Amino acid sequence: MMLQQTQVKTVLPYYERWMRALPSWRSLDRAPIDRVLKLWEGLGYYRRARNLKAAARMVMEEYDGKLPENEEQILRLPGVGPYSAGAILSIAFNRPTPVVDGNVIRVFSRIFAIRGDLKSGPGHKQIWRLAEYLLPHQRPGDFNQALMEWGATLCLPTDPRCSVCPWTTQCRAKKMGRIDQYPSFAKRPSTKSVFMAAVLIQNNGSVLIRKRPESSRWWKGLWEFPSAEGRSQREAASNLEKELGLSFEKAELANIQHQITNHRVEISLYRAAWLKHRKKPIGFRWVSPKDWSRYALPSAHMKIRRLTLNNSAK
């Protein structure tokens, strides 16, 4: 699940930390969602963490705490699609089930010179048929892992290492001198700008944060420095001031850039004073530096947290 849309080298430290904390389906099922999100903090795509916890509940309730070895059953688990099912069944249970990820698509598209949109439609189906046809019944997990590793280490998106590739002489894209034209995908959606304002509110060494509602389009259930969106940075700041009933210092403390899929998020960070007689709003919490380890923040707000900790240490 962690490897969905994330490279192995990025996942490894998270995986090791996760397995130390939640080594079984039972421990994951019993863990509070806040702890699960905290362990996932920084890895992104937090829906995967929620799906994994939901899958743990299903494994405990329907499969007696054991991961099913049947493809139909395993595909019922939240967050498990054909790619994850193939990887789990072939690697963990030695079942001859194909795996198709971005690396496999790239390798096959170049070797067999497959054109078209390979993430959907006829091209995608052709890739899956090839993966199924070529998959050996002996050690299918090793084959799938080797194929994915091939794409990750040799058949790279740019500057592929064709000189050491064992299939160079059979690669049609290489023979045609068009290796850079494969694979071809549908045009990516244009990047959209998102303007946000966040505020740093401190009181006696603690910082005010709040939990994002489940209705949020991003970062639902994670903690954040109070923030708001707008059509511009100025409007975002104005919206946040109105929401909190506060006035910000005019000088911007920092400007944080963050990318979420095809959205470029720009967060302007401001500072505001907290009146001692004022009551803390519902859903907000004062957090001291020693308690940060209890709260999961999205990566963009982790940058703000580092900034506040660095400033407080000076």
Protein language model annotation of sequence segments:
Residues 1-163, 167-176, 180, 193, ...:
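Catalytic cores of DNA base-excision repair glycosylases
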Residues 149-314:
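Intrinsically disordered, low-complexity, charged terminal extensions of DNA damage-control enzymes
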